[in-house]
Every structure is written in structure tokens, then in C-alpha cells.
Regions:
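C-terminal catalytic domain of Rieske-type non-heme iron oxygenases
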Residues: 1-211
Length: 211
């Protein structure tokens, strides 16, 4: 997918999943996502975000994937890991509420993995590659088709929002930028990335000066 925005904006988007409740209200989100607090941890070369949405209503796509009833509640998880320069891995899923998913028992639900690989093209455009994998109901092709369609639709919504965000930033009237608690993981990732870029540029400058 081609993104009309800086690659860092997409990294921030993937590390701040409370936007699911607003940008993806008809595809991936419920209001409960934005209401729950997330935890994040910064490692030496990664940032990991974890959010549990406990005892929450199940939205349409998860109903189909997990075989849940429309009025059932589920415990949802979102585990997101960023590794430099621009790889974001997601482990997401849901299980029937209060059946032990938070303690590691996912037998009453399902989960899937998502890989996002982002390649800068220019300061204001990027290439977005993604892949999805699952280990449940693997013989049902309609699930693969639904995954592709739903994911592409959701990511297209992201592309639209980020393009508008880039356009707004290009006006030069968006400073100062306001960050909120949900931005914590994204801020840590971008800070780590900026330090790495600065170090790489310094090394290149030193090498050039030595020639």
C-alpha cells in the first residue's frame, strides 16, 4: 500500500491502538478500546505495548471469527512490538470473558498475528507492507478472504487519516504538538529511532570528513 505520509506517522498509528474506537468504528473497534489503559515497556532495541480490554462487547468481525454470540462479552488482548527501524508486530485476539485468557488460557477464543513493515520513500510518502497469519480454522478459506478484506479496509482508513495528518502538518501551524497518555509507546519508539538516526548520520559525517 502507498502511504501519503511520513513513515513515522504510521509507526505512531500502530503503537496507539485507542484510535480503533474512532477511525475503525465499523471494522475493528469498540469504544472499550479507548477506555482501557495500556502498559508499555522499552527495551534496548524495542518497545512493547500491552492492552487488555476485559469483559467487553464483541464486534462483528470477532463474532464471526470466534463463534461468539452477538450479546456475549469477551476479554480482548493487544500485544504490539516495535523493532527498528520500522517493523511492528501485533498479537491480537479475544476469548470468552473470564475464561483465563489473561493468564494464558486462550482455549475459549482465538488469536492471530500481524506483521507491518514500513519503507520510507520520501519525507512525506512511504510504502506499507503487511502480512497476516492465524493458527485456527485454517481449512476455512472464507476466513482468509475475510481477513484480507477487513484488514485492507481498516488499513485504508488509516492511510486516509495519516494522509490528512501529513497534509495538516505541512501547513506549519500544528505546533506545539499535544501528546496524551496513550501516546507513550509511540513516543518511546520515535525517540529511540531518532537517536539511532542521529548516530548513523554522525558516523557517516565522520567517514566523509576522513576521506
Amino acid at each position: 500500500m502507498h502511504l501519503k505520509g511520513n513513515y513515522k506517522l504510521l509507526i505512531e498509528n500502530l503503537l496507539e491502538l485507542s484510535h480503533l474506537a474512532y477511525v475503525h468504528a465499523n471494522t475493528l473497534g469498540t469504544g472499550a478500546v479507548a477506555e482501557e489503559q495500556m502498559k508499555f515497556e522499552r527495551g534496548e532495541r524495542d518497545v512493547t505495548l500491552t492492552r487488555w480490554i476485559m469483559d467487553s462487547p464483541v464486534y462483528n468481525m470477532f463474532q464471526k471469527l470466534g463463534g461468539f454470540e452477538p450479546n456475549e462479552h469477551v476479554d480482548r488482548w493487544q500485544h504490539v512490538t516495535w523493532t527498528p527501524p520500522a517493523f511492528v508486530k501485533l498479537d491480537v485476539g479475544a476469548a470468552r470473558a473470564n475464561t483465563g485468557a489473561i493468564d494464558g488460557d486462550r482455549s475459549q477464543g482465538f488469536g492471530y498475528r500481524n506483521l507491518n513493515a514500513i519503507t520510507p520513500e520520501t519525507d512525506k510518502t512511504s510504502h506499507y507492507f503487511w502480512a497476516q497469519a492465524r493458527d485456527f480454522r485454517t481449512d476455512e478459506d472464507w476466513i482468509s478472504d475475510m481477513f484480507v478484506q477487513a484488514t485492507h479496509e481498516a488499513f485504508s482508513e488509516d492511510m486516509w487519516i495519516i494522509a490528512l495528518q501529513q497534509k495538516n502538518m505541512d501547513t506549519g501551524t500544528t505546533n506545539p504538538r499535544i501528546d496524551i497518555n496513550h501516546d507513550g509507546a509511540a513516543l518511546q519508539a520515535i525517540r529511540m529511532l531518532d537517536v539511532m538516526i542521529e548516530a548513523q548520520n554522525a558516523t557517516a559525517d565522520e567517514a566523509q570528513a576522513a576521506e
